[in-house]
Amino acid sequence: SEKYLNTDEPTRADLTTASLQKYKNMIDMWGGWKLFQELLEVLNRIAEKHDCSIANIATKFILDKPQVAGVIIGARLGITDHIEDNGKVFDLKIEQDDILLISAVTAKANDLFDVIGDCGDEYR
């Protein structure tokens, strides 16, 4: 999200919850903080072009894949800040040049299915 765009890599002390530690571990296995920043920069440029959020672009990019039937959007009880923003996904059309930009970055990353296996395998 925009929260992490152009930020320094967090230290262990910055990762104050188990969830943050897990997310950072996934980033490290995927390709590291530098590549994550590169992806966020590309997503941000595309988001600015479409007047939406980085999360909208990332969500739509995944939803448009033929093998994907849905995404689970994280939410916290009582926090409604992102409801309206998340709805933008349904009207968003990502252009082919946008897809190529995102794919150019993700092609540099490790395939997490090869690294850790299926969803939840990181806990086994």
Where are these regions (language model features)?
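Terminal-tail/helix-coil boundary detector
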Residues: 8-45, 49, 64-70, 82-124
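Glycine/threonine-rich phosphate-binding loop and adjacent beta-strand/alpha-helix elements that clamp
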Residues: 57
